[in-house]
Amino acid sequence: MVRPTRNRKPINYSQFEDSGNDSDDDFISSSTPVNKSKTVPKVLKQDKPKPNLKNLQKEEVLPTEPPKKRVALDDKVFQRGLEVALALSVKELPTLTNQVKKSKEKSTDKQGKEKTENTGKPPRVSNCSVASDDVEDLDKITEEGDASSVEGERKSPSQAKAPRRRAPSEGSDGSSANDTESESATGEGSESDPDFDESKESDEDFGVRRSKESKKKTVQKKPAGEKKERKSKPKCEASVTSVDPAPAAIKSGSPSLPQAVGLPSEATRKPAIMCSPSAESKRPKWVPPAASGSRNSSSNALAGTPAKSPSQSLRLGLSRLAPVKRLHPSATSSQVR
């Protein structure tokens, strides 16, 4: 369906010119040109300054100043104390430098005075003045002393070898051996030089050790006939004969006293070693516990029969059928013999 056309009425704005104010642009009279209305806003727009983009960026970049924070009273006092200390230290520095300079000047002055005093004093003269001839004599004396000490050192090994050679040639009797060793000790003391005192102790210790070893070897190599003779002698006689030569060695006063004193102790050991087999033969054989105690009366009758070891009756916490090892397997074999 087609709409009917509207009826439009023309409106005259001239009627409203006198009644209203001309301030509003909406109610402009129709007689005014259209161009003026368009030009007026352009002029207004040109009057307004265009803001530069650079200025805007700078304003944005500049940081806004933060508001000042209020500082506490303790912090203020601390900062003021620091400022005062810095000011005082700056004032004290020049005074310290002046004091250091003065101390250095004083030390240099003292050193200069000491040098002048030392140069003014005459050189000290020693009490012992030696002439050129005396110096030559002193050199000769020192050379002779060195030569004598070298000779003493050469003699010391030969003197230490002498007791080694005499030790194997000792006889079977301990008394004769001790007598010869005491004589050799006295002879060595008379032949030794005063320079031998320095290396005396080491050579004597070495000689004593060698003599002990040689004596042990000779005791082991002696025949059975001598052993029987030693068994017949009692221990008291052997100790008496071995102790006798000790006072002779002490009276001699020779430098080889440790050798003479150490020999009697070795001689006392010899008869004890030789008599040990006889002591072993006298020891009673092991008797089983069954033969001792209340059965002493029947021990003589059962002496010929071999006794059983006590381990057979012991159970030791095991069952009766479990085999038990004997505690003393060698006991029965020794009794049978």
Curated annotation (Swiss-Prot):
One of the GO biological process terms: DNA recombination
Residue ranges of the region described as Interaction with RAD51: 295-334
Residues annotated with Phosphoserine modification: S19, S23, S103, S107, S309
Region (Interaction with DNA): 32-50, 225-286
Biased composition (Polar residues): 28-38
InterPro entries membership: HR_DNA-Binding_Protein (IPR052003), RAD51_interact (IPR031419)
Motif SIM motif mapped to chain: 138-143
Pfam families per the UniProt record, alphabetical: RAD51_interact
Glycyl lysine isopeptide (Lys-Gly) (interchain with G-Cter in SUMO crosslink location in chain: K251
Domain of life: Eukaryota
Sequence motif: WVPP motif, positions: 286-289
Cellular component per GO, a single term: chromosome, telomeric region
Tissue: Most abundantly expressed in testis. Also expressed in spleen, thymus and bone marrow. Not detected in heart, kidney or liver.
Glycyl lysine isopeptide (Lys-Gly) (interchain with G-Cter in ubiquitin, cross-linked positions: K251
Keywords annotated in UniProt: Chromosome, DNA damage, DNA recombination, DNA repair, DNA-binding, Isopeptide bond, Meiosis, Nucleus, Phosphoprotein, RNA-binding, Telomere, Ubl conjugation
A GO molecular-function descriptor: DNA secondary structure binding
Composition skew (Basic and acidic residues), residue ranges: 44-69, 105-118
Post-translational modification: Sumoylation with SUMO2/3 by NSMCE2/MMS21 promotes stabilization, possibly by preventing ubiquitination.
UniProt function note: Structure-specific DNA-binding protein involved in DNA repair by promoting RAD51-mediated homologous recombination. Acts by stimulating D-Loop formation by RAD51: specifically enhances joint molecule formation through its structure-specific DNA interaction and its interaction with RAD51. Binds single-stranded DNA (ssDNA), double-stranded DNA (dsDNA) and secondary DNA structures, such as D-loop structures: has a strong preference for branched-DNA structures that are obligatory intermediates during joint molecule formation.
Subunit structure of this chain's protein: Monomer; elongated monodisperse monomer. Interacts (via C-terminal region) with RAD51; the interaction is direct. Interacts (via SIM motif) with WDR48/UAF1; WDR48/UAF1 and RAD51AP1 cooperate together to stimulate RAD51-mediated homologous recombination (HR). Interacts (via WVPP motif) with DMC1; the interaction is direct. Interacts with PALB2. Interacts with RAD52.
Protein name, UniProt field: RAD51-associated protein 1
